[in-house]
Amino acid sequence: FDKAKWLNDILNQEGITKSVIVGQSMGGYVGQAYAQLYPDKMTGFVSIDSAPLQRSYVTAVEIWLLKRMEPVYAHYPWKWLLKSGSEGVATSDYGRNLMREMMLTYDGNQKRYAQIAGHGFRILAAAIEKNLPYEIKCPALLICGTQDHAGSCIRYNKAWHRNTKIPLTWIEGAGHNSNTDKPEQVNRLIDEFAANILQQET
């Protein structure tokens, strides 16, 4: 929720009163927290390879695991973590290299990488456990790669679409970072979505 509040502060600072929030992975969770806190300020929401925050979608085992990921990241051999981390989130060389480059920032400081990742998973678990509605009251779009193997993203998105009727677009052959695997397609979907909202507003 801190991130959603920071986002609101930034939008206020910039004088933006009606926003289309686009969030990838953790960014999609921030968007849902923003919708919970400021439901009247969002005119659109795009989730890219993220998942619903409602408690009903997540098993108790998944929440238990989210809270305990830091030691896994800390004790996993760094070379293997680097390989699985970069190859696990993307299918394209471009996407994998971006992830590898980011992870190499922590080369020699795996403990710090594990702390940051663990913190992210714990705040996600805490947001889910709040058991809030996280209702999206504005036009929305779900985007997910067909090769997204991060957690249970594919299963979550199918259920999210089925339960809410929010349109879901699959990005063929893309991984968890579908915006880096198929950037042109994802950008086009976002552009069209935002243009439709703008048209409705005028």
Language model features with spans:
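Active-site loop/oxyanion-hole signature of alpha/beta-hydrolase fold enzymes
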Residues: 1-22, 188
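Conserved alpha/beta-hydrolase catalytic His-Asp/Glu region
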Residues: 56-58, 75-135
